[in-house]
Curated annotation (Swiss-Prot):
EC number: 2.2.1.7
Gene expressing this chain: dxs
Residues of the signal peptide: none
GO BP term, pick one: 1-deoxy-D-xylulose 5-phosphate biosynthetic process
GO terms under cellular component: cytosol
Protein name, as recorded: 1-deoxy-D-xylulose-5-phosphate synthase
UniProt keyword terms in alphabetical order: Isoprene biosynthesis, Magnesium, Metal-binding, Thiamine biosynthesis, Thiamine pyrophosphate, Transferase
Length: 621
């Protein structure tokens, strides 16, 4: 699938930033229109992130037009909004492959392009990294400029403010751009603020401001009065006082969809010294009405026909694990008014929309603040409530200290509902849930469960909710197996697995939703299969039994082999002096790139055929 570039004559002239900078300024609005249309037509045929990129077209064009990329370093926070950047940096013809196996990476990726300064995927890292680059550039005496682009969601994270606080202290030359598409200050956008932005970033204003500071620097009270007067005058028309207090020169807010005004302002700001902050207002989904009306729905899209003005409806079928969790929350909250559900900005992805509407007083979206989410749950547990933290496996990494220090050490009853455990597919290395078993298994007091199907997931969530200490239930992205779901809740016995198939010689110890693959592989092998259920505590009696009755044990998990469930089995066997060959199957010691889940499982030998082959190869040694 390729798009006919002849239908985009101006875009055809700007395959790289060098070519873009040769275009007359008068052509930039036309370029933006073509780029936006190209993006819509491309993503609708390939699937991928759409609404964010539609909102950053003008900003992307202006940045590459003004800044000498890749010498000047441009950092996109998270990276959802970077599709226009990829199109303008020599990857236009590869866009149909984005998020696909062996295709373009879904986010800016250093290995992919010299224009991708920082590999990203998680939020709120851009200002810290940009500050480091700016400090190094200043130390080396280079004229290199650094720009960090961050959204109004990502800037709420503590890490972003930690970086700005530090930048205000060390005062390097850098620019932070806030891409604001939600805040209530949108009414400030208009001719007055665009004019103010040009004035505040212009050389006359800057020279007067800096000259005045030098003249009055020996008179501290007057210097302070001048500073505060300047802030208050600006604060009358712009909401920049907070960023000024952090040590930034605040400009804006300005219209982020007026490419020529952006170019003027950026040219002025590129020459300024010290930390600069540009606040732009944009509309997520800009230029495609359905995405403007439903930016959340069009954030990440499947293949669709833009002319239909709608996304294809789900075919229904088996419920996904996120829905299983959402239904559990609603059913459990009906019985337990002390249930408190917490999410760090993942309401839709975690299946919590219905719960947030039916139980708004028991629902807490803390924004992108994983550390706070975990310790908030700590406070609720101490107060006698029953908190549940709904979080993706990859994002729990960001709250690890709090998990240990604020939950596990005090043995508090906080349950972690860990979604996207294992390989998530198209989002690649930064989003694979490969490590949660490894980093949780070493924490004292933790109970860790890995369900094999939808009903087991529901009952494990109930088990964790009723447990008197910290617990975690980890489940994968996507649909279940079609298992019948019991409406009634049944608490499982902690640390007990079950044998689901009796065989000979080989026993497969399955942790999680690979159970179906294990059973299929076991048919030709005539192997025993156990659904272990608990990663911690392990069912030690069952391991002893399986070791005594079989020649070889095989552990199977969708987690890194290093430190995972299989490693726990071997540790126990060595401590118990059980000497039997053990084959660990799981994720390898490398970061797994994007692809569909099925493609990745096949590549890694974790589908039924791969499991059977690995076991036969091991037996043949």
């Amino acid at each position: 699938m390729t798009l006919d570039i002849s239908k985009y004559p101006t875009l055809a002239l700007a395959n790289t930033p060098e070519e873009l900078r040769l275009l007359p300024k008068e052509t930039l609005p036309t370029l933006c229109d073509e780029l936006r249309t190209y993006l819509l037509n491309s993503v609708s045929q390939s699937s991928g992130h759409l609404a964010s990129g539609l909102g950053t077209v003008e900003l992307t064009v202006a940045l590459h037009y003004v800044y000498n990329t890749p010498v000047d370093q441009l950092i996109w926070d998270v990276g959802h909004q970077a599709y226009p950047h990829k199109i303008l940096t020599g990857r236009r013809d590869q866009m149909p492959t984005i998020r696909q196996k062996d295709g373009l990476h879904p986010f800016p990726w250093r290995e992919e392009s010299e224009y991708d300064t920082l590999s990203v995927g998680h939020s709120s890292t851009s200002i810290s990294a940009g500050l480091g680059m700016a400090i190094s550039a200043q130390k080396e005496g280079e004229g290199r400029k650094v720009v960090s682009v961050i959204g109004d969601g990502a800037i709420t994270a503590g890490m972003a403010f930690e970086a700005m606080n530090h930048a205000g202290d060390v005062h390097p030359d850098m620019l932070v751009i806030l891409n604001d598409n939600e805040m209530s200050i949108s009414e400030n956008v208009g001719a007055l603020n665009n004019h103010l932005a040009k004035v505040l970033s212009g050389s006359l204003y800057t020279s007067i401001r800096e000259g005045g500071k030098k003249v009055l620097s020996g008179v501290p009270p007057i210097k302070e009065l001048v500073r505060r007067t300047e802030e208050h005058l600006k604060g009358m028309v712009v909401p920049g006082t907070l960023f000024e207090e952090l040590g930034f020169n605040y400009i804006g807010p300005i219209d982020g969809h007026d490419v020529n005004e952006l170019v003027k302002t950026l040219k002025n700001m590129r020459e300024l010294k010290g930390p600069q902050f540009l606040h732009i207002m944009t509309k997520k989904g800009k230029g495609y009405e359905p995405a403007e009306k439903d930016p959340i729905g069009y954030h990440a899209v499947p293949k669709f026909a833009p002319s239909n003005n709608s996304l294809p409806k789900s075919s229904g079928g088996k419920p996904n694990f996120s829905k299983i969790f959402g239904d559990f929350l609603c059913d459990m909250a009906a019985q337990d008014p002390k249930l408190m559900a917490i999410t760090p900005a993942m309401r839709e992805g975690s299946g919590m929309v219905r719960f947030s509407k039916e139980y708004p007083e028991q629902y807490f979206d803390v924004a992108i603040a994983e550390q706070h989410a975990v310790t908030l749950a700590t406070g609720m547990a101490i107060a006698g409530d029953h908190p549940i933290v709904a979080i993706y496996s990859t994002f729990l990494q960001r709250g690890y200290d709090q998990l240990i220090h604020d939950v596990a050490i005090m043995d508090l009853p906080v349950m972690f509902a860990i979604d996207r455990a294992g390989l998530v597919g198209a989002d690649g290395q930064t989003h694979q849930g490969a490590f949660d078993l490894s980093f949780m298994r070493c924490i004292p007091n933790m109970v860790i469960m890995a369900p094999s199907d939808e009903n087991e997931c529901r009952q494990m969530l109930y088990t964790g909710h009723k447990h008197t200490g910290p617990s975690a239930v980890r489940y994968p992205r996507g649909s279940g197996m079609g298992t019948d779901i019991e409406k009634d809740f049944t608490a499982l016995e902690i640390g007990k697995g079950r044998i689901v198939r009796k065989g000979e010689k080989v026993a497969i110890l399955s942790f999680g939703t690979f159970l179906g693959n294990a059973l299929e592989a076991a048919e030709n092998l005539n192997a025993t299969v156990a659904d272990m259920r608990f990663v911690k505590p392990l069912d030690e009696a069952l391991i002893r039994q399986l070791a005594a009755e079989h020649d070889v044990l095989v552990t199977l998990e969708e987690n890194a082999i290093a430190g995972g469930a299989g490693a726990g089995v071997i540790e126990f066997m060595m401590q118990d002096k059980i000497i039997k060959p053990v084959l660990n199957l799981g994720l390898p010691d490398r970061f797994v790139p994007q692809g569909t889940q099925d493609e990745l499982h096949e590549d890694l030998g974790l589908d039924a055929k791969g499991i059977e082959k690995s076991i036969n190869d091991y037996l043949a040694k």
